[in-house]
C-alpha cells in the first residue's frame, strides 16, 4: 500500500472512494491491518477500556498513548497514523501543543481532539505549526459525564443546527478531518456534504466519507458482552483475523457496511 497522507484522504473524498479506519495499539495488528488494506490506524484512548480494563477512556495519559503510537509505527506499512489527545491533555493551548508534539514525535501523522467549535483556537494553533488535526464531534467519550452517558447526539433540531455550524467552523479553523460518532445518519450526510475535508463515521450512517470501528469490537471481543448498535462482528465466517479485517475493508468500500440497522435516526 502506498503511503497514505492527508492529501491522499482528501483525494479519496473527492473521488468518492470510501476511507477505512480501525483502532490499533501494537505492531502486529498494525502490520495485519495494513496487509488488509486499512488506510488509517487510530491509536484511540479506547485503549483504556479494551486494553487496560477501565470503564471509560478518562484514565488514559499522553505517555501511554505515545507508547502505543510508537508500537504501531514499528508495524505500520503505509497507513496514516492518527492519535487521540487524551482527556484534559488539551486543557490549555500550551498543553495542547506540548502533548500533540509528544504524540507526533512518537510517530503519529495526525492528532484527534474531541469537542466542538470551542476547539477552533487549538486546531488553528496546531495546524499553523504543521500538525494535522482531526476534530471528533457528536458523542465524545471524554465528555461522557457531561453528556449523561453514551447517547446519540444531534437528534434535536437545535443540536443538529449547532453541529453543522461547528463542523464548518472547525474546517475553517484548519481541521484536516472530522470524525462523527453516534449522530443521526441524515445529519452526518448533511455535514459530510457541507465540508470539503473527509468525514469519518462511527454510528453515523453510510453517507460519510469513511468508517471507523474499534478493532476489538469488530473482531467480536468484549469484556462486558455489550455490543454497540453500530458494530458488526466481521470474524463470523472468516478463517483468521486478517480475513476479518479484509471483509471489513471490502464492506466499507462497497457500502454494504454500515447497513441501516447500524445507524440512528433523528
Swiss-Prot record:
Cofactor note: Binds 1 Mg(2+) ion per subunit.
Residues reported in the UniProt entry to bind Mg(2+): 45, 84, 114
Binding site for 3-methyl-2-oxobutanoate: 45-46, 84, 112
Stretches of the chain forming a coiled coil according to its record: none
Keywords of this entry: Cytoplasm, Magnesium, Metal-binding, Pantothenate biosynthesis, Transferase
Domain of life of the source: Bacteria
Active site residues according to the UniProt entry: 181
Membrane spanning residue stretches: none
EC assignment: 2.1.2.11
GO BP annotation list: pantothenate biosynthetic process
Annotated metabolic or biological route of this protein: Cofactor biosynthesis; (R)-pantothenate biosynthesis; (R)-pantoate from 3-methyl-2-oxobutanoate: step 1/2
Record's subunit section: Homodecamer; pentamer of dimers.
Family stated for the protein in its record: Belongs to the PanB family.
The name this protein goes by in its record: 3-methyl-2-oxobutanoate hydroxymethyltransferase
Organism of derivation: Pseudomonas syringae pv. tomato (strain ATCC BAA-871 / DC3000)
